[in-house]
From Swiss-Prot:
Its main location: mitochondrion. Belongs to the glycosyltransferase group 1 family. Glycosyltransferase 30 subfamily. This is Probable 3-deoxy-D-manno-octulosonic acid transferase, mitochondrial. Pathway: Glycolipid biosynthesis; KDO(2)-lipid A biosynthesis; KDO(2)-lipid A from CMP-3-deoxy-D-manno-octulosonate and lipid IV(A): step 1/4; Glycolipid biosynthesis; KDO(2)-lipid A biosynthesis; KDO(2)-lipid A from CMP-3-deoxy-D-manno-octulosonate and lipid IV(A): step 2/4. It comes from the Eukaryota. Involved in the biosynthesis of lipid A, a phosphorylated glycolipid that in bacteria anchors the lipopolysaccharide to the outer membrane of the cell. Catalyzes the transfer of two 3-deoxy-D-manno-octulosonate (Kdo) residues from CMP-Kdo to lipid IV(A), the tetraacyldisaccharide-1,4'-bisphosphate precursor of lipid A. Lipid A-like molecules in plants may serve as structural components of the outer membranes of mitochondria and/or chloroplasts, or may be involved in signal transduction or plant defense responses. Keywords: Glycosyltransferase, Lipid A biosynthesis, Lipid biosynthesis, Lipid metabolism, Mitochondrion, Transferase, Transit peptide. The active site is at 66 (proton acceptor). Expressed in leaves, stems and flowers. It catalyses: lipid IVA (E. coli) + CMP-3-deoxy-beta-D-manno-octulosonate = alpha-Kdo-(2->6)-lipid IVA (E. coli) + CMP + H(+); alpha-Kdo-(2->6)-lipid IVA (E. coli) + CMP-3-deoxy-beta-D-manno-octulosonate = alpha-Kdo-(2->4)-alpha-Kdo-(2->6)-lipid IVA (E. coli) + CMP + H(+). Disruption phenotype: No visible phenotype under normal growth conditions, but plants lacking KDTA accumulate high levels of tetraacyldisaccharide 1,4'-bis-phosphate (lipid IVA). PANTHER family: 3-DEOXY-D-MANNO-OCTULOSONIC ACID TRANSFERASE, MITOCHONDRIAL-RELATED (PTHR42755:SF1), 3-DEOXY-MANNO-OCTULOSONATE CYTIDYLYLTRANSFERASE (PTHR42755). The keyword Transit peptide applies.
Amino acid sequence: MKLGVFVYRLYRALTYGVSPLIHLHIRWRRLRGLEHFSRWPERFGHPSAVRPPGSLIWFHAVSLGEGMAAIPVIRHCNEVKSDLTILMTTTTVSAFEVIKNQLPVGVLHQFAPLDTPLAIDRFLGHWKPNAIIIMENELWPNLIMAASGLLIPLGLLNARMSTKSFKRWSSPLLLPLVSLLLSKFSLIAPLSTLQGIRFQLLHAPPFVINYSGDLKYVVNKFHVSSGTSESIRDLKVELAEMKVWIASSLHRGEEEVILGVHNMLLESHPDSVVIIVPRHPHHGQQIAHKLRKDGQSVALRSQNEKLTPRKTNIYVVDTLGELRELYSVAPIAVIGGSFIPGLTGHNLSEAAAAGCAVITGCHVGHFSHMVKAMQQANPLSVTQVSTKLELKEAVDLLLSNPEILETHQRASKDVYESLSSCIITNIWKLLNLHIFRGKSRNHIECK
């Protein structure tokens, strides 16, 4: 533990020393549109809102996926303890743009402070949280040590540690530091048994590790604007006479795989349409531009372009926050982030919740536990492929056989409902036991 304290002091001194350079870096990111244009000072702990009186819980999620996983817990907390103030922080602008419309009324949002001593002290000094709930794997030393010093209970929900991160934290230099950091948590809720074992191997106290299920299974009915709902209904009408499949969460390079499969499918299914949903809107615009340059007919969602039957067979989505609704227009969902080595998969449960037949590649990394759990429950709930030809054959089988398609759809929906049941209840019991009734400056009781 002494070595861990020594390594932390080195880290603290380093982050203090490079703070001016970090400040310049954030300003540069702001000019590039990577930080919020007017709210970027929040990254240095400068608040843009007044702290309400009373108890406050801080939920932190770095990006969109983690943020959406936190929302069901935040909603439950807001319902059972309406007099409690909830603060949510995210790091990325894209996460903020989507999540701001999903948070319950009264929940505050700020951009997360950088892990520098001044930013963390400034942030904690203003907001004075009674408990801090961190999503997944944000182990920031200055934040954790400062919170511990103020006797603020810390919880890590949906805790995960990738193989790469585990190897890095296990190094002789960093193991003492991560052991020190994990010892400060009152609750670590891993998203799988394997993840729990990894945290134990990093010397997390066994009594704080409690498995409750993967929050990414809990896909509640999030708020959708009336305009979005209407446009989705219009899209369903346009696609009514076509064979539709959707390829979502695509990383750069994966569109080549999807378009190659689509071109092969057109030979046997000339009335088929593929909906392409890249992770970033700008990537979608680039895909559409390239396809048009090659002479292909493409409809771009942000421009409200219509599909022409037997002519337009590629629909590119270059908008944010609509994926759950878009799954409802396609019976087959191919989940990206899984077709190129080095990628680590994406959430399958959103498509399963919508009743899609789910297909994914073999590079699923962070979501390997989800693929395994779903396939163990019912092998038809997820089809995993390794090559472009296997993907083509899997989609072709479903497009050609309505009965087989319906069986796969029902399997994914049933497995989702089974795996998602009681997760929020279990999480809430753990939070109430380990966090809200734990040792802190101000006792919180949430029933």
